[in-house]
Amino acid sequence: MREYDYLIVGSGLFGAVFAHEASKKGKKCLVIEKRDHTGGNIYCEEINGITVHKYGAHIFHTNSRRVWNYVNDLCEFNRYTNSPIANYHGELYNMPFNMNTFNKLWGVVTPAEAQRKIAEQRTAVSGEPSNLEEQAIRLVGTDLYEKLVKGYTEKQWGRDCKDLPAFIIKRLPVRFTYDNNYFNDPFQGIPEGGYNRITDELLDGAEVRLRVDFNVTPENRAY
């Protein structure tokens, strides 16, 4: 007779939710985690009294009221709204690209004005884009590329945009509204006190073993 009903590899959000739901149905779960902590990439650390997302940042967002109610039953969420600001040599721009960005960049106030400006600048590249730089310009024009795409992308990839393939950027989000909210989902926030409160609650009914890796072999495949 097996000691456990389920062996769950990984204690991140997926594994923790599965363990929680299975435990509620009377199933015995063993969760193994190769790291020295639970929570996967949403794990948080307390540093000088500040909750830090070790692998983050992670902003929870969903368009499902059912999912939102589920996580709020586990832990209270704050009302944080993700509205990033990009700093280009002391010039501050709202992200993702929206009418506040375009107003700061060009002084335009209507969507039609912004669309015309982008359309004019997109013509700087003709034909099929051969690299990421050309692809980005074809999508959003030269000004947005030079100030808000080029530096970030080159830092991310460690290479010049001209040396990166065009397919890396399929699309760039552009909004012609005065909305600085990064996400379109109606529900978003960060759990008060960090994500550890959620994963601790989810894993409460399961046995958890840390620093245990798992490799599928012929011997354990039929577990």
Question: Model regions: which residues?
Answer:
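Core beta-strand elements of the Rossmann-like FAD/NAD(P) dinucleotide-binding domain
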Residues: 2-4, 217-223
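Dinucleotide-binding Rossmann-like beta1-alpha1 core, especially the glycine-rich loop
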Residues: 48-123
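Active-site/ligand-binding neighborhood in enzyme catalytic cores
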Residues: 89-93, 100-220
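N-terminal Rossmann-like FAD-binding beta1-loop-alpha1 element of flavoenzymes
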Residues: 4-31
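Short amphipathic alpha-helical segments and helix-helix/interface helices
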Residues: 19, 68, 199-203
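Short glycine-/acidic-enriched loop or helix-start segments at secondary-structure transitions
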Residues: 18-19, 41-42, 219-220
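Glycine-rich FAD pyrophosphate-binding loop
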Residues: 23-48
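Conserved beta-strand segments of alpha/beta enzyme cores
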Residues: 28, 51, 76, 207-209
